[in-house]
Amino acid sequence: MRHAIAWRTELLTVMLIVLTTLRLPLVAAAQRPGHVPRIAFLELNFPPSTSEPSPLLDAFRQGLRERGWVEGHTIAIEWRWAEGSLERFASLVAELIRLPVELLVVPNSQTARIAKEATTTIPIVVVAGGGMDRLVGSLARPRENVTGLATMTPELTLTHLELLKEALPGVTRVAVLRGLAPYDAIWPTMEATAQSLGMELQRFDVRDPTAFDSAFAAMTEAQADALMVLGDAFFVPYPARIAALALQHRLPSIGPGGAQAGYLMSYGASESDRGQRIAAYVDHILKGATPADLPVEQPTKFELVINLKTAQSLGLTLSPVFLFRADELIK
């Protein structure tokens, strides 16, 4: 009996040694540095100046770090700037697919369509997409390989008119800078809102970068009192240029963004909040989720930013009550 027990003990010892030996490579593999995913963040505009903060990009990086993704260590990020050219954007997408990358972050619906035409397998996350329902089919359960954040840009135009009137009660003629995005459906509502505020809208279409100068000259000819820039992917690369022309023509300006570039004020979805939420999308996808698992979300946090330097350059004095409403004052 003692021999049988000893034999079983020896057998168990041998089996334990064998199993431990077989497990060693797995333990060693788990302890080796893991796979470092490579993603791409593409912008349609120009690279930001090192002297100017980018709330969106800063919050995106911070959001990744908070989730354990440290650039250069646990994640590699390919940053690309299309410098206002959709053709260049398409070339950059093709380049990144060949690299390859595991995920594409793109600025809007227009660029998402370009990326979607180039790949149906690489997940695409949209930073601020208009008409996302048409792009993904279902906001609750996106089809194919696209998800991200939607915009409420058309609805914001009504708030922009109200803010202009509150900040500058004497404004009666508002130049509306319009690009390629469709605003025909909401235009009658915009006109009715303006009329109720004692203002008249003057529409100026710019669909080519060379047309900005002539458009602003026409605004001056029409004796516009202020400028409202509509949310449009076409304008994304040119906020500094638009701001400079508005200042040159003495037009207080407002848009969904642009205050950092020199607009008098901007009101729109918080860039910092967007950056954090895009980081969350990236985190979920890198951990195994698919775009279909991640519903398209609407913006929930909005910010009023007022550029006091622009106000001073225009000789404007804004009321303390209005300034108190601002989420950020640029001094």
What are these regions (language model features)?
Residues M1-K331:
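Short hydrophobic alpha-helices and adjacent helix-cap/hinge residues
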